[in-house]
Curated annotation (Swiss-Prot):
Keywords: NADP, Oxidoreductase, Porphyrin biosynthesis. This is Glutamyl-tRNA reductase. Pathway: Porphyrin-containing compound metabolism; protoporphyrin-IX biosynthesis; 5-aminolevulinate from L-glutamyl-tRNA(Glu): step 1/2. It holds the Pfam family Shikimate_DH.
Length: 449
């Protein structure tokens, strides 16, 4: 739906597990801040009609969120971004075109709110996505690729996600890919009658930490292979049973890779961590879970190794989705309402309506006082038109500097607070002003985590 307004035009491009294979998502994935900054800078350099931009890259999706300059053609922006992606990732534009989902304006806002609320996730209700979006926004904001427009959008998205979690039961069951993987591992453990409840975990990022917590919850012991011993020491302080977890440097991978029946791998490496040249024959069967995108485990050549990728877990997720249909429906109602409220709030913060309302308030006040003066015969009736002109010129002169200042600050980060304060001071649309006043946008929720 195209809005007939000068409000910011929101725009999203999405490649997800629903539309794109794991192999293609691997090519799109960005796993380092340096690469992400370079990609965002390329967009900034080659897409002058994109005002602000951020990228969300996870194991299940690659998405670009942007605000466009007024009058920008959305199809032209899509084509430009697909061309940049194709060149950057050595893919064809036609392949990307087949998989991309574009949203603009209200549908873009609804999409961002749905993603943040985990309604578009492989595991509906998983809470990891909100944190990933906060990190993506934080990076783009701090590197100055986004400002007021996306801050407004993401701040409201975080509020919407919190409301969905609080008002529905959508996050009460299995809540992440990691929990589904551990649940499947437990089923394998019981079916295979494995003696020792032990697992090898490669990585110590957010996904790996979730795996470890789920393993401990199921009474497993875990050996972690990573690069940062200090990070491990900080992590185990969060655990109820830290003695069930041990750490070795990942350089010792060869010494452990053939010793465990259960293995979970989740690192940000763009290359295979576990390679076939490391493998030896074992008398026991092995079950490996590769939760990384790009994948960290080379497809095993040994017959007794069973490898599960992120996409392989999808059938195990379907039951999770079916169990949450009622919660999903309620959640989508909340997202729909939040989308409407977002645009109402944005419109309440626009500078032009405030300037118009201020001038109208001045005109009404002047006219009211003039009529009082005429009624009490302080001035003759025949002078009414001349006095109206004098008053009109007077309040125009009075409001000239504030008008210039408001227009000058319209695109600055503090404009929302400024407009909210003016509306509150002059009682202009008081309900909306109070709402704006309660939202301190530049202390965004990501600072709380």
């Amino acid at each position: 739906m195209e809005l007939e307004t000068h409000l910011s035009k929101y725009f999203t491009l999405a490649f997800t597990h629903k539309s794109m294979s794991l192999e293609m998502r691997e090519k799109l994935a960005i796993n380092s801040n340096a690469t992400l900054k370079e990609f965002l800078q390329t967009i900034k350099n080659h897409c002058p009609n994109i005002k602000e931009c951020m990228v969300l890259s996870t194991c299940n999706r690659f998405e670009i969120y942007a605000s466009l300059k007024h009058g920008a053609n959305t199809n032209e922006q899509k084509n430009a971004l697909l061309k940049i992606l194709a060149q950057n990732k050595k893919m064809s534009v036609s392949d990307l075109e087949k998989c991309v989902l574009m949203n603009t304006d209200e549908s873009a806002v609804h999409h961002v709110f749905s993603v943040c609320s985990s309604l578009d996730s492989l595991v509906v209700g998983e809470t990891q996505i909100t944190g990933q979006m906060k990190n993506a926004y934080k990076f783009a904001f701090e590197e100055k690729f986004c400002s007021k427009d996306l801050t407004r959008l993401l701040h409201f998205a975080f509020k919407c996600a919190a409301k969905v979690r609080n008002l529905t039961g959508i996050s009460k069951q299995g809540v992440s890919i990691s929990s589904v993987a551990v649940k499947e591992a437990l089923n394998i453990f019981e079916k295979e009658r494995i003696k020792d409840k032990k697992a090898l975990v490669i990585g110590l990022g957010e996904m790996a930490q979730l795996v470890i917590k789920h393993l401990l919850n199921k009474q497993f012991e875990a050996l972690i292979l990573g690069r940062n011993a200090a990070k491990f020491e900080d992590f185990i302080k969060e655990l109820e049973e830290p003695k069930k977890v041990s750490f070795q440097n990942i350089e010792n991978l060869n010494a452990y890779i053939n010793e465990y029946e259960l293995l979970f791998c989740a690192t940000s490496s763009p290359h295979f961590i576990v390679q076939n040249r490391m493998l030896k024959e074992t008398i026991f069967r092995r079950f490996w879970f590769d939760l990384a995108v790009p994948r960290n485990i080379e497809k095993p050549v040994l017959d007794n190794i069973f490898l599960y990728s992120v996409d392989d877990l999808e059938p195990m997720v379907r039951e999770n989705v079916e169990n949450r249909q009622e919660s999903r429906m309620r959640a989508y109602e909340i997202v729909g309402l939040a989308t409407m409220e977002f645009y109402q709030w944005i419109q309440s913060l626009e500078v032009e309506p405030v300037i118009k309302d201020l001038r109208e308030l001045a005109r009404i006040s002047a006219q009211k006082e003039l009529q009082k003066a005429l009624k009490k015969r302080y001035v003759p009736k025949e002078y009414e038109n001349n006095i109206e002109k004098i008053l009109h010129n007077a309040f125009n002169t009075f409001l000239h500097n504030p008008t210039i200042a408001l227009k000058k600050n319209a695109q600055k980060e503090e404009s929302d607070v400024l407009v909210g304060a003016i509306k509150n001071l002059f009682n202009l649309d008081k309900s909306n002003a109070n709402h704006a006043q309660n939202l301190n946008l530049y202390k965004c929720e990501y600072y709380e985590e």
